[in-house]
Amino acid sequence: SVTVKENLKGKFYAYNVFGEYPEFQGKKDVVDPYAKCVIGKTGRAMVINEKSYGKKDPLRSNVPLSSSVVYEIHMRDISISEDAGTTFGGKYLALTQDKTAYQEKAVKGKKAAKVSTLLSHIKELGVNTVQIMPIQDFDNDESNENEYGWGYMPRYFNSPDGIYSSNWKDDSKIREVRKMVASLHKNGLRAILDVVYNHTAEGFYGEGIYSFNAFVPYFYYRFGNGYISNGSGCGNELRSEAPMVRKFIIETLRFWTEFYDFDGFRFDLMGLIDLETMREIVKELSAVKPDIFIYGE
C-alpha cells in the first residue's frame, strides 16, 4: 500500500509492471484489476471516494425468494425507444423515473390510450425482481452511444460500464447505478445483476492484455495439454479454483453487494465455476445479505 498526503479524488492512476514476459518489452502501464471507476476503451483507473456517493435505499419488499418473479432487462433495449417515455433513453437513469408511459396516437372511433413503460410497466406485470444484463465494464467503446453490446465480455469487474451513463468521461456511472438500484428498491423490486466470471475479454498478446495477464501471465486462466481452455466459447476460462482468482471473484461480488446494494447475482455459465468457489460466494455474500439471491446457468 501507499499513502499520498493530498486529495486524489478524480485523479487517474496505473501500475507499472515489468518482467521477463516478452509482451511487456521491459515494462507496461496496467490498469488496476480492482479499479472501481475505469474510463474509456483503453482503460484509465480513476480514484474515487466511496463515502461521497450518498446513502443507499433499502429494499421495500417482504416477498420471499421462493415467490420471486424475475424479469430480465437489457439496460439499453428497455429504454432506448422514443416511445419509452423517458428523457434518459438507453441509460441507467431511465429506471429512476416514475409514471413513464407511451401515448398512443388517436385513431378515428378509438380513444387514444396511455401505455405504461419502464418501472411502471414492470410493476404492472406483477414482477418483484429485475435481472439486469451485464453492466460490469465490458469490451466496447464507451464514447460511441450507438455501439451495441450484451456485456458478456468483461474487462474490469469492479467498474460499471460507462456507455449507459450520462457522462462516460467521469464517475457519473457510479452515482447513476446506485440511483438505479435505490429506485428499484423504492418500488419494491429486487435488483439482480447478471455477472460473467467464467471468462474475460482479455487476450494473451499485445493490446489484448488488460490486467490479469500483465500481473501474472497465464495464472488467471485454465490450460489443458498446453492449450488455452475454452469451454466458454469466448476465448478463455477463468481459473476460479486458483486461490487468488477465487479471492478476486468473491471480493468483487461483495463490493457490488455492499456498495451498490444489489440483492443477488445471476451467473453466466455457472457450470465453468468450481463448486468450492460457488459455495464460498454464497457463504460470504450471505453474511452481508442473509437473503442474497444466487442462481445461474
Language-model regions: role of each:
Residues 192, 264-270:
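Short catalytic-loop micro-motif centered on adjacent basic/acidic residues
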Residues 270-276:
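Acidic-and-aromatic substrate-binding clefts and catalytic sites of carbohydrate-active enzymes
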Residues 71, 193, 296:
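Active-site flanking residues adjacent to catalytic metal/cofactor-binding acidic residues
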Residues 207, 269, 296-297:
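Substrate-binding/catalytic cleft of secreted carbohydrate-active enzymes
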Residues 2-108:
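The feature marks proteins involved in alpha-glucan
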Residues 35-41, 46-48, 261, 282-297:
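Conserved alpha/beta catalytic core and glycan-binding cleft of carbohydrate-active enzymes
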Residues 76-260, 278-289, 293:
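Substrate-binding/active-site clefts of carbohydrate-active enzymes
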